[in-house]
Amino acid sequence: MNQVALVTGAGQGLGARFCARLLAAGFDVVVSDRDFAQAQACAGQLQGQGGRVLAVKLDVASKADFEQALAQVLEHFGALHVVVNNAAVTKTTPLMQISPEEFDAVVGVNLRSVFLGCQVLGAHLAEAGYGRIINMASLAGQNGGTATGAHYAASKGAIVTLTKIFAKEFASRGVTVNAIAPGPIDSPAVHAAVPAERLPGLLANIPVQRLGDANFLGDLIVQLARPEAYFTTGATWDVNGGLFMR
């Protein structure tokens, strides 16, 4: 039986790409998104590319939605093994122009979603005695922001810490929790945040002189989702072209 992986914010962009890579690696995939029509469309495109696919509606700011999504997954597949907390809002508002409401809205999606995903779905994985959780952080959360807003960067930095906290919580119960911190990736979100006229300047500042490969991120998720990844937990995996080196 295939393992089952749920990806949040998977109706488009990187989330959809991650679903495709997981399918190609032999996982059954749950495409979850706040926009159910988008999740359904993505699931339809993925049909026939590997394992079984299920679309579910999931507002990642809602604990009740996570609980309902888990119930749907268990009813459909009978199990859940892997969680990819990918959903995020990207804002580029200048620091001194960010309103308290906008700050709360960004943190309320980017950080709250990881907390709820780890808490609700992680509790189920821990009870089952096995699981893999991968949280999408960002280079912006490590170096104080890049082309993104301070609220985005702060939320992504907090994900790195939250990853360690949940990794400690679940370590003895067969569940690993890791984060991936991408730099600029060749993705719709990056191209939307960086105007075409600024792209050459961005590339010039990346040591490898290129944007990152979205498929590689998906393949890294696959590796961290494997049973053999049991000895890797609480780590943040940097994929940034040399922009941030430990």
PLM features per residue range, with description:
Residues 94-95, 102-107, 190, 202:
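Substrate-binding pocket helix/loop in short-chain dehydrogenase/reductase
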Residues 171, 176, 232-234:
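Short, small/polar-rich loop/turn modules that mediate ligand/substrate recognition or access, typified
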Residues 143, 222, 233-246:
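Short C-terminal tail/terminal secondary-structure segment
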Residues 118, 155, 163:
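Active-site helix of classical SDR
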Residues 138:
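Residue(s) in the substrate-gating loop at a strand-loop-helix junction
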Residues 1-30:
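Canonical Rossmann dinucleotide-binding motif of NAD(H)/NADP(H)-dependent dehydrogenases/reductases
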Residues 123, 164, 168-169:
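Alpha-helical segment proximal to the catalytic Tyr-Lys
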